[in-house]
């Protein structure tokens, strides 16, 4: 694929004038004679890259003509003869994130030669790592009698997690410079208030330093012991942090809808479980379907932020099993299904339902008006719609309407709150689905944020089995925390490396790998897990596998080693693939006592392949020819090459044939 000057500038970090001076060329077919032989073959470029130019570091410099990095050997005030398109962008992407360490290895070059086409590609392996502190969660170490308070602990954890999943989020953005006093002192992440005070000063006084507060806050969320409850919802916070104005409105509306639905089914479930409840005051009862646009009234009544204290207080009124079903049903919107119910009374939560209105059943009326009502709701949002509104279908003919009424007469006895609640959920789900379609592509990648459903369903299964204990809760908390970090990082890499069209068009992602190493307090490896994926959807497929894998492993906590007959079933539950690491490591992870784990190291490894572009400027080609000839003569005499930036005069071009090829280089081929 042809590379434009602008694309090269974006992906190399150079300015457009620099690339215009460089004159990039991708296909050197019939242009090979313009370059020294070492500059056109994979072996020759490897030799030049390693011993002369040091491309792995040179590509990160400003290489404009006359820039400081170009003044002496081997560039002599000109850009290099090649640019590795996308390499600098990859390094910048990894550097912009909160990794503790980054390594780039196996920088290699490959040739593609066929009649009419001769190109060279570069490839590299990037390994970015950071460690999160998952050590002893205070709830499990400060309790003398854990079993007596197990239900309260479980309810508290669920309440905090649900608040994080359903509470409305507001982005927190800082601009300008933040200065903090006390150079060299340890800066704690929670010292943001002190930073705000120091930032008021007009100038920077002695003893102050500029502090990357965003980096400090990210480090804060790497430590479960310190951030405690604030760890929940980290992935969603960063998602909305990166959203534009339109996406913020849509994402906030989606969360309001999920919150309203959760509050609605909780109130309905609580009402069923308390038959002696007092009737609701008329002012709080919604009469349906008289309110044709009932969604607005629904949101107004139910979208108050989910409160942790009120959720904890539900312990006596709503069994944990039903609470979990309600959570799964709300968080999985617009997918999933409504929570099962066996109550057939005409209640519908705080809605007052009338069996028939104007000769038509309530639920059927809502169903018929659903599409038009949803369109009106979206049209009232303060955003410009990206998709054209599809007009609602025309009303059915009188004959069909009469037949429908006859069917409703027959099915009148079947009209129940089960159908009504299903219609409420179907309407909310369809509305959320439509709002997600209105999101920009960068904000629509919800596949990275659906991991919560897997964990809630795992706890639901444990609750059904009566297997909630300290071990399962500890692992549930720890793996949920790990999943938050994994989702956040994979989403970031997806946005920068796959969702950025210019990079995705020219640079191929060959392999994406996540390595999870659990370590004890001495730093020893307790177990290690590996997940690999390739292709266009590598990041989302990795997240789906990791989420399912960790959630399934929660159910094995505290059970010790797996028996032979259990291993095959467990491998099926985690959807084991051959590229998921050693089976013994997986079994060790399932059987380990999680109190031994002090930290979890997450490594994100990427193998990418991108294009090499050649210069068409004669002056750069001539300098390269003279540099290669001089370096080849030094190598032939077993002398050391000058260090990059050495004050070596530009050597003259020796007379006669070109110097011999570097080791491993192939001669030119003519087709």
Curated annotation (Swiss-Prot):
UniProt GO BP: DNA replication; viral DNA genome replication; viral DNA strand displacement replication
GO CC annotation: host cell nuclear matrix; host cell nucleus
Feature type site, description Priming of strand displacement replication by covalently linking the first nucleotide of the new DNA chain: 580
Region (Disordered): 386-411, 645-671
Site, as annotated: Cleavage: 175-176, 349-350
Comp. bias intervals (Pro residues): 649-665
Record carries keyword DNA-binding: yes
Modified residues (O-(5'-phospho-DNA)-serine): 580
Subcellular location as annotated: Host nucleus matrix
Outcome when changing residue 582 to N: Decreased pTP initiation activity to 85% of wild-type activity. No effect on DNA binding
Consequence recorded when altering residue 582 to R: Complete loss of pTP initiation activity. No effect on DNA binding
GO MF term list: DNA binding; double-stranded DNA binding; single-stranded DNA binding
Modified how: Preterminal protein is used to replicate viral genome, upon genomic encapsidation it is processed first into iTP and finally into TP by adenovirus protease.
UniProt-reported outcome of changing residue 578 to R: Decreased pTP initiation activity to 7% of wild-type activity. No effect on DNA binding
Keywords, alphabetical: Covalent protein-DNA linkage, DNA replication, DNA-binding, Host nucleus, Phosphoprotein, Viral DNA replication
Ranges of compositional bias, category Acidic residues: 397-411
Annotated consequence of substituting residue 578 to N: Decreased pTP initiation activity to 29% of wild-type activity. No effect on DNA binding
Motif (Nuclear localization signal): 380-389
Entry keyword Transferase: no
HAMAP family noted in UniProt: ADV_TERM
Similarity remark: Belongs to the adenoviridae terminal protein family.
Complex and partners: Heterodimer with the polymerase; this heterodimer binds to bp 9 to 18 of the genome. Interacts with host POU2F1; POU2F1 binds to the auxiliary sequences in the inverted terminal repeats and tethers the pTP-POL heterodimer to the origin DNA thereby participating in the assembly of the pre-initiation complex (POL-TP-DBP-NFIA-POU2F1).
Function: Protein covalently bound to the viral DNA that acts as a primer for viral genomic replication by DNA strand displacement. Assembles on the viral origin of replication in an initiation complex with viral polymerase, DBP, host NFIA and host POU2F1/OCT1. During initiation, the polymerase covalently couples the first dCTP with Ser-580 of pTP. The terminal protein stimulates the template activity over 20 fold compared to protein-free templates. Neo-synthesized viral genomes are linked to two preterminal proteins, one for each 5' end.
UniProt protein name: Preterminal protein
Species this chain originates from: Human adenovirus C serotype 5 (HAdV-5)
Source species taxonomy: Viruses, Varidnaviria, Bamfordvirae, Preplasmiviricota, Tectiliviricetes
